[in-house]
Amino acid sequence: MTLGCLCILVSCCLFGYSQYRQYKEIKNMQTLYEETIPLIPDNYISSQGGYLDLQGHYIEAVLEVGSIHWVIGDEETLPHYKNKNIIIPESLLKQVQSLKNRDILTIHAVSGETIKYQVEVIGKVDQLSKSMPALYCKNGSSYYCINLIKV
Protein backbone atom coordinates (compact mmCIF):
# COMPACT_ATOMS: atom_id res chain seq x y z
CA MET A 1 0.00 0.00 0.00
CA THR A 2 2.75 2.43 0.96
CA LEU A 3 4.69 1.56 -2.18
CA GLY A 4 1.61 2.26 -4.33
CA CYS A 5 1.09 5.65 -2.69
CA LEU A 6 4.76 6.45 -3.16
CA CYS A 7 4.56 5.54 -6.88
CA ILE A 8 1.50 7.76 -7.33
CA LEU A 9 3.22 10.62 -5.52
CA VAL A 10 6.36 10.29 -7.67
CA SER A 11 4.34 10.14 -10.91
CA CYS A 12 2.36 13.24 -9.89
CA CYS A 13 5.60 15.09 -9.14
CA LEU A 14 7.09 14.09 -12.50
CA PHE A 15 3.92 15.16 -14.33
CA GLY A 16 3.92 18.49 -12.49
CA TYR A 17 7.57 19.05 -13.32
CA SER A 18 7.03 18.27 -17.02
CA GLN A 19 4.13 20.75 -17.11
CA TYR A 20 6.30 23.38 -15.41
CA ARG A 21 9.15 22.79 -17.89
CA GLN A 22 6.77 23.08 -20.83
CA TYR A 23 5.32 26.32 -19.42
CA LYS A 24 8.82 27.69 -18.85
CA GLU A 25 9.93 26.84 -22.43
CA ILE A 26 6.84 28.54 -23.87
CA LYS A 27 7.42 31.59 -21.65
CA ASN A 28 11.08 31.79 -22.77
CA MET A 29 9.93 31.53 -26.39
CA GLN A 30 7.50 34.42 -25.83
CA THR A 31 10.27 36.53 -24.29
CA LEU A 32 12.59 35.85 -27.25
CA TYR A 33 9.74 36.67 -29.66
CA GLU A 34 8.98 39.98 -27.92
CA GLU A 35 12.67 40.96 -27.97
CA THR A 36 13.09 39.97 -31.64
CA ILE A 37 10.05 41.71 -33.18
CA PRO A 38 11.29 45.32 -32.68
CA LEU A 39 14.66 44.39 -34.22
CA ILE A 40 13.23 43.16 -37.53
CA PRO A 41 13.26 45.92 -40.18
CA ASP A 42 10.00 46.99 -41.86
CA ASN A 43 11.57 46.78 -45.32
CA TYR A 44 13.48 43.90 -46.85
CA ILE A 45 17.26 44.20 -46.55
CA SER A 46 19.12 41.84 -48.85
CA SER A 47 21.13 39.42 -46.74
CA GLN A 48 21.92 35.76 -46.77
CA GLY A 49 22.31 33.70 -43.63
CA GLY A 50 21.62 36.65 -41.31
CA TYR A 51 20.61 36.12 -37.70
CA LEU A 52 20.19 37.97 -34.42
CA ASP A 53 22.07 36.93 -31.29
CA LEU A 54 19.64 37.27 -28.36
CA GLN A 55 20.33 35.77 -24.93
CA GLY A 56 22.84 33.41 -26.55
CA HIS A 57 20.33 32.16 -29.15
CA TYR A 58 20.83 32.72 -32.87
CA ILE A 59 17.44 33.87 -34.17
CA GLU A 60 16.75 33.65 -37.93
CA ALA A 61 13.06 34.58 -38.03
CA VAL A 62 9.81 34.80 -36.10
CA LEU A 63 6.76 32.68 -36.82
CA GLU A 64 3.17 33.78 -36.17
CA VAL A 65 -0.07 31.88 -36.58
CA GLY A 66 -3.15 32.61 -34.50
CA SER A 67 -2.09 32.89 -30.86
CA ILE A 68 1.26 31.17 -31.53
CA HIS A 69 4.32 33.44 -31.57
CA TRP A 70 7.64 31.61 -31.88
CA VAL A 71 11.18 32.39 -32.92
CA ILE A 72 13.04 30.23 -35.43
CA GLY A 73 16.63 29.64 -34.38
CA ASP A 74 19.43 27.25 -35.18
CA GLU A 75 19.32 24.95 -32.16
CA GLU A 76 17.30 21.86 -31.24
CA THR A 77 15.49 23.52 -28.32
CA LEU A 78 13.89 26.12 -30.61
CA PRO A 79 11.89 25.72 -33.79
CA HIS A 80 14.53 25.50 -36.52
CA TYR A 81 14.94 24.96 -40.24
CA LYS A 82 15.96 21.60 -41.69
CA ASN A 83 16.00 21.57 -45.49
CA LYS A 84 12.67 23.18 -46.52
CA ASN A 85 11.00 22.16 -43.27
CA ILE A 86 10.51 23.78 -39.89
CA ILE A 87 11.15 21.37 -37.02
CA ILE A 88 9.30 22.13 -33.79
CA PRO A 89 10.48 20.78 -30.40
CA GLU A 90 8.25 18.08 -28.90
CA SER A 91 7.46 20.33 -25.93
CA LEU A 92 5.38 22.51 -28.28
CA LEU A 93 3.31 19.61 -29.69
CA LYS A 94 0.03 20.75 -28.09
CA GLN A 95 0.35 24.17 -29.71
CA VAL A 96 1.16 22.59 -33.08
CA GLN A 97 -1.88 20.32 -32.79
CA SER A 98 -4.08 23.38 -32.16
CA LEU A 99 -3.46 24.62 -35.72
CA LYS A 100 -6.37 24.24 -38.15
CA ASN A 101 -6.59 23.88 -41.93
CA ARG A 102 -6.47 27.23 -43.73
CA ASP A 103 -4.82 29.08 -40.83
CA ILE A 104 -2.33 31.61 -42.18
CA LEU A 105 1.22 31.19 -40.92
CA THR A 106 3.53 34.20 -41.31
CA ILE A 107 7.32 34.09 -41.12
CA HIS A 108 9.24 37.35 -40.68
CA ALA A 109 12.95 36.81 -41.39
CA VAL A 110 15.49 39.03 -39.65
CA SER A 111 16.20 40.52 -43.09
CA GLY A 112 12.68 41.99 -43.14
CA GLU A 113 11.39 39.45 -45.68
CA THR A 114 7.85 38.23 -44.95
CA ILE A 115 6.51 34.91 -46.22
CA LYS A 116 2.92 33.72 -45.73
CA TYR A 117 1.76 30.12 -45.85
CA GLN A 118 -1.62 28.44 -45.60
CA VAL A 119 -1.70 25.53 -43.16
CA GLU A 120 -2.78 22.05 -44.31
CA VAL A 121 -2.91 19.61 -41.38
CA ILE A 122 -1.68 16.13 -42.34
CA GLY A 123 -1.34 14.47 -38.93
CA LYS A 124 1.07 11.66 -38.02
CA VAL A 125 3.77 10.59 -40.49
CA ASP A 126 6.75 8.26 -40.09
CA GLN A 127 9.45 10.38 -41.72
CA LEU A 128 10.28 13.88 -42.89
CA SER A 129 9.55 14.76 -46.52
CA LYS A 130 11.74 16.90 -48.76
CA SER A 131 9.10 17.45 -51.47
CA MET A 132 7.29 20.51 -50.06
CA PRO A 133 7.70 22.87 -47.11
CA ALA A 134 6.19 21.50 -43.93
CA LEU A 135 6.13 22.03 -40.20
CA TYR A 136 7.05 18.90 -38.22
CA CYS A 137 6.88 18.14 -34.53
CA LYS A 138 8.32 14.95 -33.02
CA ASN A 139 5.52 12.83 -31.55
CA GLY A 140 6.98 9.70 -29.97
CA SER A 141 8.52 7.60 -32.74
CA SER A 142 6.67 9.49 -35.50
CA TYR A 143 6.12 13.13 -36.48
CA TYR A 144 3.06 15.38 -36.48
CA CYS A 145 3.07 17.03 -39.91
CA ILE A 146 1.53 20.22 -41.26
CA ASN A 147 2.10 21.11 -44.91
CA LEU A 148 2.77 24.76 -45.72
CA ILE A 149 1.30 26.13 -48.95
CA LYS A 150 2.77 29.47 -50.00
CA VAL A 151 0.13 32.21 -50.33
Region locations from a protein language model:
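Solvent-exposed, non-transmembrane regions of membrane-associated and secreted proteins
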Residues: 4-151
